[in-house]
């Protein structure tokens, strides 16, 4: 009997025992029953043996009346227990007896409330009645039946309740005779009960299945009573099966919602409101399905496998995420379906959708993390693969192929992460990946193009810089045409190579033109940069050119100022060349547009030295008094006219010293070469020495002596090379001649003595003897032997050689 878990459901004051019912539900494991359960309640007069009948019929342990202590109220309120060894699970409710003296005749409220509650929750209602009351007008069961029928009008139930009339203390009258009388009495009571207008003509059979059973007296025929009860017990086995006592299962509340349903029933009954069982069924289903859904959400959140997934997706991509999460969701929803299967379908489905939506809300952040990790991983692998592809393929082909491959990989990865229960669209993440890939491709393209541009710009710079510098250094009329030709040739070569290298990028025409134009502009900028550099050094270049032309002759040999050179003409030529260099460097001439810079500079700077030019310059407008050149744009101007004028003034000032030094050197050379007395001295000598001159002419001896002296002097002049010695200065010449004078005199005298002692010989033999000596001694009369001397002849006269010991 202990397995019946007897519990007071509602006490005598009408207070519902919520905690007691919850414990009872757990003890009997009602949550596992679903719709496979039945509720049986019993009504009847007080002390009519209701509890005794239930205890024998269902083997419960309800408190029974002790006949030896007198008849009094035993059951207060409503009690509940579980029938023992009856399938399906059967709940038994023992109601407080009617017409008890404890409540009095006027207190029928609780009777009606408990009756209504029993009809609302029960599948089978046992009406316990005395056999001797059948057919009596004032029978004890009539008020009870009236109460049952009256409260039934307040129940809007779609199902029929089974009323099982249990006739107690059966007499000798057969049941076949008693049953028609009982049914007739029941019909009369039904007809006499006030009904709503909609049910004025509704027969009793629409609301109840009436069954009648008779039992012998428990006190007088206990064994027979027990046999009859055992037979009746068999009818409660599988009572919910079709044809059973509780065969009509329409509107039944699932077992898991029984507790809440009972509470709500009693609450509405206590508020004296009509019970709309269909609406109540929906309400119970709504609350219970909501509870089941919340339980499943809590269960899903606490699931260890889900927590592991949730943690894993925070850090990296998880393969098979979609399938695994789908299985978890399926399991959770299946559990919900199993627990909520017996509730109202509409409510169940609605709450299932809500549960699914909430579960998906829980899963969505993890799904988004998976896609983000997939996008990040795909992008990283794309970058590596793209870099490798660039080593084998052209840029555009590699970018196109890699983009296609990795977008397809993302699609496969997103399919792997897809959850079966929902069709989340990964297109936004894919679009972001596509934008990231395009941004990376654009970045690499820009980098590669920049490297390519730098490469060809470097080549162009290398091809132009030094040649342009050399051409600008030469600074002639052909300088800028040569630079233009060089620029055109090298730019064309660079553009051709750059264009071929760009082909793999498959750039649009506009971009190609921009890059090619940039390369062409770079070539011009190199030339312009070099021109500006050279323009900054133009003064140095001008001085170098002037120095080169002024200090060196046409054969690039150092110029010696002997006195015969035209320094003025040389200076003008050198300055004109420097002026041409200045005019060349004054402007950038990459276009073939003509200008008059050279003419302007020539007129303003060089031609001012001509007679009459100075006066005209003073009277007319200065062409260099301007900040720009005629027909030359400002951006092409390297040196303005005013700057040219200033540079020329500085140039002249810094080269004036060189010219002055040349003039001084020429004058000094002239002085050194002029060893004759001044003309006035010669005139004085002629006047004052006229008498002596006439004496010499009149005396032949003097003339002979003078002739000999002339020959000796001539020989000394040639032998000592006096003219050359004096070119080195007066004092050095005197010192050099003083050391050579005596040896030379001795050499000459010795040679004359030798010549006088030799016999006369033919002239030809003499020439042959003298020729080797002349060749051996050389044009500078170098010493060949310490004790020999010879006399040679040349075109300029006899030449004497004197040996000098080395």
Curated annotation (Swiss-Prot):
Boundaries of each GB1/RHD3-type G domain copy? 34-249
Superkingdom to which the source organism belongs: Eukaryota
A Pfam family recorded for this sequence: RHD3_GTPase
The UniProt record lists the keyword DNA damage = no
- Output the PROSITE patterns linked to this UniProt entry: G_GB1_RHD3
Q: Give the subcellular location.
A: Endoplasmic reticulum membrane
A single Gene Ontology biological process assigned to it is: endoplasmic reticulum membrane fusion
Concerning Gene3D superfamilies, the annotation shows: P-loop containing nucleotide triphosphate hydrolases
Protein family according to the UniProt entry: Belongs to the TRAFAC class dynamin-like GTPase superfamily. GB1/RHD3 GTPase family. RHD3 subfamily.
According to UniProt, the name of this protein is Protein ROOT HAIR DEFECTIVE 3
């Amino acid at each position: 009997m202990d397995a019946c878990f007897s519990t007071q459901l509602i006490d005598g004051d009408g207070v519902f025992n919520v905690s007691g019912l919850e414990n009872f539900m757990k003890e009997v494991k009602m949550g596992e029953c679903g719709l496979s359960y039945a509720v049986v309640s019993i009504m009847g007069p007080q002390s009519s043996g209701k509890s005794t009948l239930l205890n024998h019929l269902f083997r419960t342990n309800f408190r029974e009346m002790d006949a030896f202590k007198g008849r009094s109220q035993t059951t207060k309120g409503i009690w509940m227990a579980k029938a023992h060894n009856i399938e399906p699970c059967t709940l038994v409710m023992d109601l407080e007896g009617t017409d008890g003296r404890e409540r009095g005749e006027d207190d029928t409220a609780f009777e009606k409330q408990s009756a209504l509650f029993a009809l609302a929750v029960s599948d089978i209602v046992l009406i316990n009645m005395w056999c001797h009351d059948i057919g009596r007008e004032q029978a004890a069961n009539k008020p009870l039946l009236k109460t049952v029928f009256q409260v039934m009008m307040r129940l809007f139930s779609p199902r029929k309740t089974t009323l099982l009339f249990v006739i107690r203390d059966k007499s000798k009258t057969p049941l076949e005779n008693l049953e028609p009388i009982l049914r007739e009495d029941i019909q009369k009571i039904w007809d006499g009960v006030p009904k709503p207008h909609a049910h004025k003509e509704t027969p009793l059979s629409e609301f109840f299945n009436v069954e009648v059973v008779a039992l012998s007296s428990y006190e007088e025929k206990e064994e027979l009573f027990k046999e009859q009860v055992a037979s009746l017990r068999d009818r409660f086995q599988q009572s919910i099966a079709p044809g059973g006592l509780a065969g009509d299962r329409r509107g039944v509340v699932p077992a898991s919602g029984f507790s809440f349903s009972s509470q709500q029933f009693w609450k509405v009954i206590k508020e004296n409101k009509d019970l709309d069982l269909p609406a109540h069924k929906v309400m119970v289903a709504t609350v219970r399905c909501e509870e089941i859904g919340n339980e499943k959400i809590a269960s899903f959140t606490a699931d260890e496998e889900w927590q592991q997934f949730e943690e894993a997706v925070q850090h990296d991509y998880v393969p098979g995420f979609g399938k695994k999460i789908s299985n978890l969701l399926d399991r959770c929803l299946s559990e919900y379906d199993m627990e909520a299967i017996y509730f109202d379908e509409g409510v169940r489905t609605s709450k299932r959708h809500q549960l699914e939506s909430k579960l998906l809300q829980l899963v969505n952040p993890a799904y988004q993390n998976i896609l983000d990790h997939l996008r990040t991983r795909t992008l990283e692998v794309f970058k590596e693969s793209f870099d490798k592809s660039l080593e084998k393929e052209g840029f555009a082909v590699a970018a196109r192929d890699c983009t296609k491959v990795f977008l397809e990989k993302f699609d496969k990865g997103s399919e792997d992460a897809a959850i079966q229960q929902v069709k989340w669209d990964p297109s936004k993440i894919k679009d972001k990946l596509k934008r990231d890939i395009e941004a990376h491709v654009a970045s690499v393209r820009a980098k590669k193009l920049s490297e390519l541009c730098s490469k060809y710009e470097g080549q162009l710079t290398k091809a132009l810089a030094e040649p342009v510098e050399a051409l600008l250094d030469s600074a002639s009329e052909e300088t800028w045409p040569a630079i233009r030709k060089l620029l055109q040739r090298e730019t064309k070569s660079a553009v051709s190579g750059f264009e071929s290298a760009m082909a793999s990028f498959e750039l649009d025409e506009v971009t190609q033109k921009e890059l090619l134009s940039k390369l062409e502009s770079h070539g011009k900028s190199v030339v312009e940069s070099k021109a500006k550099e050279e323009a900054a050094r133009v003064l140095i270049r001008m001085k170098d050119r002037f120095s080169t032309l002024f200090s060196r002759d046409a054969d690039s040999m150092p110029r010696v100022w002997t006195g015969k050179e035209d320094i003025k003409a040389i200076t003008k030529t050198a300055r004109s060349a420097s002026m041409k260099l200045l005019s060349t460097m004054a402007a950038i001439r990459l276009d073939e547009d003509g200008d008059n810079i050279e003419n302007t500079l020539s007129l303003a700077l060089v031609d001012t030295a001509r007679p009459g030019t100075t006066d005209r310059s003073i009277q007319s407008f200065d062409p260099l008094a301007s900040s720009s050149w005629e027909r030359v744009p400002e951006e092409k101007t390297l040196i303005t006219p005013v700057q040219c004028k200033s540079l020329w003034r500085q140039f002249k000032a810094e080269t004036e010293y060189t010219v002055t030094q040349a003039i001084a050197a020429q004058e000094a050379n002239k002085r050194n070469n002029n060893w004759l007395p001044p003309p006035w001295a010669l005139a004085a000598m002629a006047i004052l020495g006229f008498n002596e001159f006439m004496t010499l002419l009149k005396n032949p001896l003097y003339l002979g002596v003078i002739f000999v002296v002339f020959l000796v002097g001539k020989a000394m002049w040639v032998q000592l090379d006096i003219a050359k010695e004096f070119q080195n200065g007066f004092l050095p010449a005197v010192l050099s001649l003083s050391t050579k004078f005596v040896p030379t005199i001795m050499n000459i005298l010795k040679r004359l003595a030798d010549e006088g002692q030799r016999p006369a010989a033919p002239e030809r033999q003499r020439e042959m003897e003298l020729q080797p000596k002349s060749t051996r001694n050389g044009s500078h009369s170098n010493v060949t032997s310490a004790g020999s001397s010879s006399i040679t002849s040349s075109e300029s006269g006899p030449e004497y050689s004197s040996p000098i010991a080395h």
